[in-house]
Amino acid sequence: MDLIKIAEEAFATGKQHPSFKAGDTITVAYRIVEGSKERVQLYRGVVIKIAGHGDKKRFTVRKMSGTVGVERIFPIESPAIDSITVNKVGKVRRAKLYYLRALTGKKARIQEKRVNQ
């Protein structure tokens, strides 16, 4: 049991990300290594689900690339994640938004929650 905790602490990045939930539109700056070059790719989409807990937490982001829906799963403690930015706070009543996969066009939009700042 202690070996698992030691391994988790060794791989923990310790980065602080903003809090977000399912339905929020976020931008993930993800570092990609291509050969000897490294670049940052921005991936913007709607958070469909958040799964796991602690260091093993991961979230799924769905975006539309043309007419095709693309989903990507990001571990929250991934060292390749440069930053996470919350663009919109969505107004949803579910924790898992799998129903968005079947919707297209304006039906797939999520209402924006008004946030006082």
Curated annotation (Swiss-Prot):
PANTHER family the record matches: LARGE RIBOSOMAL SUBUNIT PROTEIN BL19M, RIBOSOMAL PROTEIN L19
UniProt key word Ribonucleoprotein: yes
Function: This protein is located at the 30S-50S ribosomal subunit interface and may play a role in the structure and function of the aminoacyl-tRNA binding site.
Name of the molecule in the record: Large ribosomal subunit protein bL19
InterPro entries for the chain: Ribosomal_bL19, Ribosomal_bL19_CS, Ribosomal_bL19_sf, Translation_prot_SH3-like_sf
An individual GO BP term: translation
Record bears the keyword Ribosomal protein: yes
Pfam families named among the record's database cross-references: Ribosomal_L19 (PF01245)
Annotated keywords: Ribonucleoprotein, Ribosomal protein
GO MF annotations in UniProt: structural constituent of ribosome
A cellular component term, taken from the record's GO annotations: cytosolic large ribosomal subunit
Disulfide bridge map: none
Family: Belongs to the bacterial ribosomal protein bL19 family.
